[in-house]
Amino acid sequence: VKIHRAYRYELDPNTEQRLLLAKHAGAARFAYNWGLARWIEIYEKEGRTTNAIELHRELNRLKKTDFPWMYEVSKWAPQEALRDLEKAFQNFFRGRKTGRKVGHPKFRRKHDRRDSFRLDNSSGTIRLLLDGLDPRHPGKARHIVLPRIGAVRLKEKPIRRKKGGVV
């Protein structure tokens, strides 16, 4: 059995990092809304559904010409938003099949909710800096390194993982 550990930390970003975090959240919201509109369009025109991978490939093709500002954010923000959209449609169709009343995925509005985005760490780009000894970020302890954003200070002290022990 593989156990996944998750930690939740509150960030203490500077002004520039706040702007970058807002851009990531905006790109995720845009990708979700674009994907939802595209999903509906494909279903109405072709009578089939699509998936997150197909939408992400199409968004990447359009990025160069139509959405060059998306190069300012990590590739993970829009990709994870499209995965969330696919999961929303899976939940919608599963609910319809079982007879439950389930709402159709809705467009995300800019001012209706707290801005958020997710990043994937399968490539190991997100790292906790605990002791300030990282050669790429000297002297930065109590920080987390996020792709395209850099080392962001944490408000609280991170938990150190004990070797061979229980946390």
Residue spans for each PLM region:
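Nucleic-acid substrate recognition interfaces
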Residues: V1-V167
